[in-house]
């Protein structure tokens, strides 16, 4: 019951729920590889690892803002950002988060998710969380085009 926010983990899932959800999501999606265009495989892997670590830290910050906003309109499943190895969260240069807004297996939450006003509250909470993150952590010059999108 409640909302959850997940970000990528380098060390595995923070809970059994996170691990199971990541396995299910990863089996459902095919993910293309990252082409760094480097001839030195070791260098390419090192650069990717460094970038991924920085992105995970940024994603954790983003997740905290999202949880703060979601917690103002919904019960939180957990008060902290969870981590798991979701294939869809592996972009090495863009903070990303997977948001579970509720559990449709819970009749009360399913009813709320079908309510237009509640959907709007969820959307506004997510937008606020993203805006808070970017207002405090603006993109570096190399990523300014992403901020315009």
What are these regions (language model features)?
Residues 1-149:
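Active-site-proximal helix/loop segments of hydrolytic enzymes
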């Amino acid at each position: 019951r409640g909302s959850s926010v997940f970000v990528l983990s380098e060390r595995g899932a923070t809970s059994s729920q996170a691990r199971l959800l990541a396995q299910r999501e990863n089996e459902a999606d095919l993910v293309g590889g990252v082409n760094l265009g480097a001839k030195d495989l070791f260098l390419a892997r090192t650069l990717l690892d460094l970038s991924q670590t920085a992105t995970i830290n940024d994603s954790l910050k983003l997740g905290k803002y999202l949880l703060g906003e979601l917690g103002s309109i919904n019960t939180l499943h957990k008060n902290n950002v969870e981590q798991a190895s979701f294939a869809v969260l592996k972009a090495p240069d863009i903070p990303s988060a997977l948001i579970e807004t509720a559990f449709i297996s819970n009749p009360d939450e399913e009813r709320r998710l079908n309510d237009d006003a509640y959907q709007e509250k969820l959307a506004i909470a997510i937008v606020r969380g993203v805006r808070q993150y970017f207002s405090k952590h603006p993109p570096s010059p190399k990523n300014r085009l992403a901020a315009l999108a």
